[in-house]
Amino acid sequence: MERTGPRDPETTADEAAPEPAPGTAPEPAGGDAPTAPEGRDGTRRRPWVRPLRRTALVLALLLLVPLLAAGTALRVNYMGDPADGTYTRDRDAMWLGHAWVDGRKKDADVTALARRLEDTGIRDLYVHSGPLEHDGTLPESAYPRARWLIDAVHRELPGVRVQAFLGDVLATEGPDGMRLTRAATRAAVVRSAKQVLDAGYDGVHLDLEPLHSGDRDYLSLLDDLRSLTRAEDARLSVAAHQIDPLPALHSVAGLFADHPKWWSQEFFGQVARRVDQIALMSYDTAQPLEGTYGGYVAQQTSLALEVTPPTTHLLMGLPFYYESNPSHWGHAETVAAAVRGVRLGLSRTDADRELFGVAPYIDFAATETNWEEYREGWVNP
């Protein structure tokens, strides 16, 4: 699922028939209507049944064959061995929930987090500090304990950056939400970014959804934010939609659904060139099998690497949560499959890419299995 604000149930260390059409001849009365011929068993044959069945079969095959072909291709994409050296570069990141800045977390929780992150490659924390209002503003009351968290992380985890994760729902598929077409709204988002940087954050992590491919207003907003963060010596990072697994698939999907889902590879590259870090949300893929999910992640990794400049830090999202629904099958979207897919994509496209990492989503839903698969597959393969 593409998420603008994490759900955050965290605990702390302390806690009728139609009329005949005009001109239609009525059927003969008195039993003179023709009847269907009888079969050998005495039952009446219906001449329309067999063509209908054939049509249904053809339609089913038209739907099934492409799905089987796509699934097979993804499963093949999951085959092979990752290249040596395709593991953490100590440039990973992690999304954290709102409890870290609203007062629910305490010093003991930071200590526990430090122990958890010890000897991992996680160097950036995207801490949910919003959401933004639809007009682009951000109430300071949304992050009352930000300064405490930033100081505590810098003390317990030297070298780890704390970025303000700011998101909102866009009015791209419904009447409510933020409208980036309004210059005043974009300007307010920039002011909100300045606000959190003044509060001590090391960067701004933007997640606006659903964001359609080719949105020029979004690119304009990123240009303005980049000017700000450069002047403040801070990081600008974004959460990015998945890339078309087939050319122009987002356009085809947009014809049949309100939610096109993917970005074009070209648009992904345009976004990547405007930020310091881009995190592709490579989860909620609707893949039904672990092998097809891993193959999909391998493909997404390659597509992203092809258009992300080497000066931009690319991260691939890992599903540190378990759900079972049509968009995310927990038995298929495992951390192990995601990590192996990332390593395969990296191996095939740019095995020596330095500014590259993975990003677990999200801390409060993570299980021990998630952490083990991350460590075994990526940190210590």
Regions found by a protein language model. Give the residues of each.
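N-terminal carbohydrate-binding accessory modules
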Residues: 48-52, 70-94, 105
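Conserved, mostly hydrophobic/aromatic
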Residues: 125, 206, 278, 316, ...
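Hydrophobic membrane-insertion alpha-helices, especially the h-region
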Residues: 54-73
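Chitinase-like catalytic core of GlcNAc-active glycosidases
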Residues: 84-111, 116-120, 124, 128-274
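N-terminal Lys/Arg-rich, disordered targeting/topogenic segments
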Residues: 1-53
